[in-house]
Structures are given as C-alpha cells and as structure tokens.
C-alpha cells in the first residue's frame, strides 16, 4: 500500500529502507483515486518508534492511505521533541470538523492510573465521542482498547498480580468474521501491560464479540457491533526489539521486571529475539482497512 505522509517525516526514510512504498505528497496529488484518510492518535511516549511500527503495519494492501498524526493538547510528553510534534502532529481541535475513514488510538503508559486520573482523559473522551459521527471505524490498541471499552461500554480494567509481558499463544474463536480472515487457529501476539479487562464483563454485552483470546494472556481481539469500534488488547504493531527495549530499560532503572515470556531464545536476553507475530499483525491491519474501512466508508466523506 502506498502510505502518504509528509515528505520530511523521519519514519519515511526508515520504512523506505525496508522497501515499503512511501508516497510523497506531490506524487499522491497526481493519482486519480481517493486515498483512505486515517488518523492516528499517538499516545505512546516514544512517538517516532510508534509511527514506524504503525505505518509498517498499514503498508500491506494496494490502497492508498493518507495519514494524519494526532496528539493531545492537554498533555505534552517529555520523550518526543516539541519541534517534531509541531511539524508532524495536529490536535483534535485542528480536525474536529473533518471526517476520517479510520482512526487508530494507541496504547499509553498510564494503565495503572484510573481513567479519570489521566491528564488528557477529558480530551480523549471528546475524541471518542467525535469518532462516533466522524470516523467510519476506530481501532483501539492496548490501553486505548481498555479506554474505549470503558468509555463506550462501561467495562472496567483490573490490576494484574504481575505484568503481562511477552509473546503469547492465542486461539481464534470466530473464523467467519472478516477481521480475522487468513488467521491460523492458533497464533502469537505481544502483550505488555499491568491490567486486564474481564472476559465475563465483555460477554455480558450483546454488542461485543470476542474474536481471539489466550489462556494465559486473556482476551486479545473484541469487536463492537458491525466493526465501528474494534479493540485489541495487545501490541500487534510491535517490532522485533520493542519488548527487548522495554525490558532492558526497566533493568537499567533498577526496576523489578521479569523476562518477557516466550521471547528470547532459551530465555537468554543476550540473544536476538525471534519475530513470530508479524504475519498475523499484518493480516489484522489489512483486514481492518479492507473490510471495515474501505468497503464501508462513503466515497465522499
């Protein structure tokens, strides 16, 4: 898929080196097709890493995608240069009168706080309410999925005794749903979180369907209604070394952290981790764009 981004976005050069087709603004203007307009609300602290991961994940269909990065106005993180945010990001206030084919709400390192304690919670609520009328389909990731289930369905999150950290095996529960088309019966996905959402509470809501879950890691993929809202509790977009970076960061800080499960060969953190989840991650994003965005959205937004 040609991904349309600003010409000078640093992630563009990284992905071009991976032979991923990144289309500049000038060339995109001369294509006689309407690109899918996708907004990404990037709540992760290392925003440039997340940009690369998500753009890579969105690059596997022939559809042209026009990306708009969003950040919060009520909170500015310390891990991304202000100049980068000013150059490549907008806020909800900037786009509130626009319509998008799709929206991705990322995770955020705030899951051990109550939702109402998060500095930008009120702003996020406005964005999620706005998405009901201005976005064809919204994909919520990790904490973003917990926040979405809480806001739209009143489903709470609960603390885990130990961090869910590693690569876990999941079972497919509903093969007929297009979101998981092409998935194997059993597949792997990364998790990195301190809280969980109750399977029982999800099942009590007739509008929600669990599509995949793990005996160890719990629910992974939940679909709301006809796909207007999709919730993914893990991090399928993570690249090979993301969990490695998180683990070694916490070790260097002197924090108590266990090895990520099923990640390092022989549980040796000096060895290069195996990349065992990307095919299904790519299928997830491709299916979302194709079946829940492209085939549903009107030609004129």
From Swiss-Prot:
Key word Amino-acid biosynthesis present: yes
Residues that coordinate or bind substrate: 163, 192, 249
GO cellular component term of the entry, any: cytoplasm
UniProt keyword Nucleus, yes or no: no
EC numbers, comma separated: 2.3.1.31
CDD domains: GATase1_HTS
Highest taxon of the lineage: Bacteria
GO molecular function, a single term: homoserine O-acetyltransferase activity
Chief subcellular location: cytoplasm
GO annotation (BP), single: L-methionine biosynthetic process from homoserine via O-succinyl-L-homoserine and cystathionine
Alphabetic keyword roster: Acyltransferase, Amino-acid biosynthesis, Cytoplasm, Methionine biosynthesis, Transferase
Cited function: Transfers an acetyl group from acetyl-CoA to L-homoserine, forming acetyl-L-homoserine.
NCBIfam families: metA (TIGR01001)
Annotated family: Belongs to the MetA family.
Name of the protein in its database record: Homoserine O-acetyltransferase
Organism of origin: Lachnoclostridium phytofermentans (strain ATCC 700394 / DSM 18823 / ISDg)
